[in-house]
Amino acid sequence: MPEGLNLRLLDVLGAAADALVDELDADACAISRVIGDVLILVTERVQAGSTLQSGQGYLVPDYPQTGEVLETRVPRTLTLDDPDVDAGEAAILRALGYGSLMMLPLEINESTWGLVEVYRMDRRPFTSADVARAVELCKIT
């Protein structure tokens, strides 16, 4: 991919992360590239002085709910109050200081390119309207 196209995509992804946080009353957003079974953070929108970067990628098989989103291409929301939240997903949320998460696939050219994660510090769940808006904001053409 030409360098100019890569920069344009990063600009588009950064703008999408900004819009998701602003429009969904969220506290943070991460957009990661999926390469095989690994998620690599490519852009984030967080509060000043913080990061979602862990220093390494995440292995998708370690997080079954994330894997399900990537495989089925169906968005998923969860909170730390959910009885069926995966222990690995819950541990990451707690470590990052968040209580609610929306995950959705990022599709480019009709294939799953990456994962979008939108976070809230509180445990207030994302609504179906939030999910619908996130899907619209993540359409990359």
Q: Which residues does each predicted region cover?
A:
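Short regulatory/linker helices and ligand/cofactor-binding micro-motifs at input modules
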Residues: M1-A19
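GAF sensory/regulatory domain recognition
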Residues: D18-D22, C29-G57, P61, T66, ...
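Regulatory sensory and allosteric helical modules in signal-transduction proteins
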Residues: V34, S50-R94, M102
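A short, aliphatic-rich beta-strand micro-motif
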Residues: G99-E107
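Short glycine-/small-residue motifs
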Residues: M103, G114-L115
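Flexible loop/coil segments at beta-strand boundaries within sensory signal-transduction domains
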Residues: E107-T112, M121
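Amphipathic alpha-helical "output/dimerization" segments
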Residues: I108, F126-T141
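Short beta-strand-to-loop transition segments that serve as allosteric relay/switch motifs
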Residues: L115-P125
